[in-house]
Amino acid sequence: MIQVKASTGLVALLGHPVQHSLSPLMHNAAFAAGGQNLVYLAFDVKPGDLAAALAGLKALGFRGANVTVPHKEAIIPYLDAVDPVAARIGAVNTIVNEDRCLKGYNTDGSGFLRSLEEAGFDPAGKRAVILGAGGAARAVAFALATAGCGSLVLANRTPERATELAGALAGAGLPAPVVYRLGDAGMRSEVEAADLVLNTTSLGMWPRVEETPLPPDWFRPGQWVYDLVYNPLETKFLAGARRRGCRVISGLDMLLYQGAAAFTLWTGREAPVAVMDRVLREAMGASSGGPAAGR
């Protein structure tokens, strides 16, 4: 258990809303296990209050912060510095306060790739379909492209946003994805041909658990299907894929590994991943036998 003292450092979660987040549970367990004199707190920050919240982090000497929806892209102009990877992605999910200089990083992409590695999927040369075009989609699209993914397809409810992301990838010298409107019939052949189908939208997240971004009959046996939503642990999207014989990965895995990378940025230490994984799965009512891929 963390003993809060006058010297205890603070780490924040900035988002709107944040009441559902498991990050405080995960990081406080990690700080305790690693002997770090830090405590992690969630703050519901409305978009109009973002600049003031960052000024508060700096004034109060916070060690750093995580950034979640809807601030991952909007926060960049308010930071003092941005890591080149995060700048290229155009989204920040982690902040480190370095001598009153707030520097933004993106651990979503590296956390996503590590979750694929732990599950046994190598994206090099593979075909991937990404559903969504927000901050998380940007991170995983850049991660897949830089990892040598053979082809990318983007699908979003507003295709203009997906087209902008495709342009950003092309502008960075990476292969430009094909773009669809989410749910268009023409997508079906792309989904069926894909090695990896990834949902980065909020469709299916509690309490709207009956929603799914794709009909399950678009999947084929042997595909990898990944949902960044982790509440519920098995979404309707993943349940449909599992019934079709797909190998599935829960969003809890990306939460775990992006969190582990953020822990290292704040502390300079290797994260206690086993502790973080156990706490997350206990919170979700799942077994703690490791990442949820294939289960």
Curated annotation (Swiss-Prot):
Catalysis: reaction(s): shikimate + NADP(+) = 3-dehydroshikimate + NADPH + H(+)
Entry EC number(s): 1.1.1.25
GO molecular function list: NADP binding; shikimate 3-dehydrogenase (NADP+) activity
Keywords: Amino-acid biosynthesis, Aromatic amino acid biosynthesis, NADP, Oxidoreductase
InterPro entries attached to this UniProt entry: Aminoacid_DH-like_N_sf, NAD(P)-bd_dom_sf, SDH_C, Shikimate_DH, Shikimate_DH-bd_N, Shikimate_DH_fam, Shikm_DH/Glu-tRNA_Rdtase
Top-rank EC class of the record's enzyme: oxidoreductase
Amino acids binding NADP(+): 132-136, 156-161, 228, 251
Pathway(s): Metabolic intermediate biosynthesis; chorismate biosynthesis; chorismate from D-erythrose 4-phosphate and phosphoenolpyruvate: step 4/7
Pfam family, one: Shikimate_DH
Residues reported to bind shikimate: 21-23, 68, 93, 108, 230
Disulfide bonding pattern of the chain: none
An annotated GO BP: amino acid biosynthetic process
Active site: 72 (proton acceptor)
The keyword Lipoprotein is annotated on this UniProt entry: no
Functional description taken from the UniProt entry: Involved in the biosynthesis of the chorismate, which leads to the biosynthesis of aromatic amino acids. Catalyzes the reversible NADPH linked reduction of 3-dehydroshikimate (DHSA) to yield shikimate (SA).
Family designation: Belongs to the shikimate dehydrogenase family.
Subunit field text: Homodimer.
Protein name stated in the entry: Shikimate dehydrogenase (NADP(+))
